[in-house]
Amino acid sequence: MIKRLLEAVIRRTKNDTFRFDDSVPLSAIFELLVTKLMSLLRGFRVSFFIGSFSKIYLGKSVKIQHTKNIVFGDNVIVGDYAMLSALGKGPLSIGNNVNVGAFSRVIISTSYNDIGEFITIGDNVGFGEFAYLGGAGGLSIGKNSIIGQYFSAHPENHIFTNSKSLIR
């Protein structure tokens, strides 16, 4: 009964054709349920703080900085130990049904003297573990994209007209 109830919830919120494999034990389903509920509770805390009513699932030890500059879509999953930092001129905008893999970093800028531009992530995007997205020069990831593990993007605002000027 629990298995069918959880299937119905997953179908309604994430995947309308979802069905647990018959060989999945009930203990694994309970573990999934507890993990997702804990992630949702952590997400509610962030949603309340930023005044958003999106479903946000946060894994263990997720770090979020500059929350007032983040726009969350619905059904956003941020994996364990990931980091979101929205120090930028524009927002860190995360679309609907986005999954940020564990240990990933989505950081507009690390510089406080010349802050970065923005990061926009479209709907239905998935990131593998340990991905790094920087937004110093502005970064847009289109909808329905899949980004593999260890992917790294670092757009910058380099001055190419002066070859003697360092780019760091």
What are these regions (language model features)?
Residues 153-162:
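Proline-centered turn/helix-capping motifs that create local helix->coil transitions or kinks
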Residues 164-168:
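Surface-exposed acidic, glycine/proline-enriched linker/cap segments
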Residues 1-154:
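Domain-scale signature associated with acetyltransferase and cell-envelope carbohydrate enzymes
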